[in-house]
């Protein structure tokens, strides 16, 4: 049996990041943790491109454009959707996740989805550092995995 090994070497990988500006304090924390981890994995700052969007629902459209541009090896979606008093939380959470998955499946470009969906600010704040860094790990691993197939 041939086993494909995990490869977290980010050297020479080109990464696009789409950051939702809604709940910006959470998004900025995710971005910092993500970029710090990308650097630790060997991704050069010049190989990281950031685009911001108003909210999570707008992320898939920009991710699709980035994927279609053939300028990126992988993409990362960052942001936070925090439950409010209306059904809007479910719509935004579900549709942004579906849109991101659709882009990934239709283009073959790996996308790490770190748009947090939480019940409250405290839950989001508790996840910022870990989820931001995990997104970096996920995208680098998936890029390298796809290269081995």
UniProtKB/Swiss-Prot annotation:
Keywords: Riboflavin biosynthesis, Transferase. One of its GO terms (cellular component) is cytosol. Its EC number is 2.5.1.78. Pathway: Cofactor biosynthesis; riboflavin biosynthesis; riboflavin from 2-hydroxy-3-oxobutyl phosphate and 5-amino-6-(D-ribitylamino)uracil: step 1/2. InterPro entries: LS, LS/RS, LS/RS_sf. (2S)-2-hydroxy-3-oxobutyl phosphate binds at residues 85-86, 127. It holds the Pfam family DMRL_synthase. One of its GO terms (molecular function) is 6,7-dimethyl-8-ribityllumazine synthase activity. 5-amino-6-(D-ribitylamino)uracil binds at residues 22, 56-58, 80-82, 113. It catalyses: (2S)-2-hydroxy-3-oxobutyl phosphate + 5-amino-6-(D-ribitylamino)uracil = 6,7-dimethyl-8-(1-D-ribityl)lumazine + phosphate + 2 H2O + H(+). It is an enzyme of class 2 (transferase). This is 6,7-dimethyl-8-ribityllumazine synthase. The gene is ribH.
